[in-house]
């Protein structure tokens, strides 16, 4: 299996002194680090109208070293060969891609968190208008929890190369900047507003979520490219319901949305999860648990964008220690 990781010597030279500082408590002395890890395995069938069907697999590996209750070093290793793709295809030359895409130091307290290094593209939940959850940003993120269920996030760094093999190639990317304000209004309403600069473009993003009931949430998301007359909009709902078969009830989760992406929106549109194309589109996904004991899940998803349609179906297994 091919495993390519670029040199990260400069990053380690910066992170290691911070690890040494974090690993020492003035009152308790040296603290023993704790290692944890998680592995997600997915196998899926991908049938797209504009090309032959294929069978794919994905591995996501999350190792983490907790230095103290606040400090940790984290990494992320995944299959696939570009920013928004994390699947390898059986029976082709692209069956053995496996790359480390992140390596970062995190400090987290009740007041917020700071991440430094090759960091995730998200601070928590991944929005439909956000960057792919398998992507990366080289830089620093700071999230500050404010009063009344509000928070502000600032990310400063670099982002340009979308090849997973170049994720650790520091210093050759364009500037990346993001500032985001998020808030909850009671138990049912929440919103986010952000400004982003990336890939030689500037973007304003807004998101509103409304909790319909205990199970279902409706949302609307808009990203406007401010230096061009182009936008992306997503309107949808997510939640869960109970299906019955053979006198047995099965909880099923769903996710459905309509979207529109201008053809002139730019490269940012291609950096979302499983990008299918620009224009009018929609998606409907159902998922559930096959085995709680063994942490096995199933999913079925149908996507349509203009004249292109896609059907995805598969299973996912998780292991954690």
Model region roles, listed by residue range:
Residues 1-32, 293, 320-321:
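Cleavable N-terminal export/targeting peptides
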Residues 24-115, 142-150, 154, 184, ...:
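Beta-barrel outer-membrane channel/assembly domains of diderm bacteria
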Residues 30-42, 52-56, 66-74, 108-113, ...:
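Signature for the C-terminal beta-barrel architecture of outer-membrane proteins
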Residues 47-48, 88-92, 125-129, 165-167, ...:
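Extracellular loop and loop/strand-boundary signature of outer-membrane beta-barrel proteins
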Residues 99-100, 124, 136:
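Short acidic (Asp/Glu) patches
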Residues 118:
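Residues on the solvent-exposed faces and adjacent turns
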Residues 240-297:
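Outer membrane beta-barrel transmembrane domains
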């Amino acid at each position: 299996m091919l495993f390519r990781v670029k040199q990260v010597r400069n990053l380690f030279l910066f992170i290691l002194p911070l690890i040494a500082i974090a690993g020492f408590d003035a009152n308790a002395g040296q603290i023993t680090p704790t290692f944890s890890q998680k592995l997600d395995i997915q196998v899926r069938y991908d049938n797209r109208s504009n090309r032959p069907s294929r069978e794919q697999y994905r591995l996501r590996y999350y190792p983490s070293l907790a230095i103290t209750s606040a400090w940790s070093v984290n990494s992320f290793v995944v299959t696939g060969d570009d920013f928004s793709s994390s699947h390898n295809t059986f029976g082709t030359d692209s069956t053995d891609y496996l790359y480390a895409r992140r390596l970062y130091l995190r400090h987290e307290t009740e007041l917020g968190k700071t991440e430094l290094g090759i960091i995730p593209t998200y601070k928590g939940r991944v929005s439909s208008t956000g960057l792919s959850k398998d992507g990366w940003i080289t830089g620093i993120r700071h999230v500050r929890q404010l009063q009344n269920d509000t928070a502000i996030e600032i990310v400063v760094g670099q982002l340009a190369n979308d090849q997973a093999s170049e994720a650790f190639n520091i210093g050759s990317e364009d500037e990346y900047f993001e500032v985001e304000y998020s808030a909850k209004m009671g138990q049912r309403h929440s919103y986010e507003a952000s400004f982003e600069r990336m890939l030689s473009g500037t973007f304003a993003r807004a998101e509103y979520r409304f909790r319909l009931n205990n199970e279902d949430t409706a949302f609307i998301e808009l990203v406007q490219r401010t230096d061009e007359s182009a936008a992306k909009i997503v309107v949808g709902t997510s939640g869960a319901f109970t299906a019955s078969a053979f006198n047995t009830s099965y909880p099923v989760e769903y996710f459905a949305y309509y979207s529109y992406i201008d053809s002139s929106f730019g490269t940012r549109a291609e950096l979302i999860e499983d990008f299918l194309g620009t224009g009018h589109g929609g998606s409907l996904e159902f998922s559930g648990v096959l085995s709680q004991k063994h942490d096995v899940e199933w999913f079925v998803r149908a996507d349509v964008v203009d004249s292109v349609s896609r059907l995805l179906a598969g299973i996912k297994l998780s292991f954690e220690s």
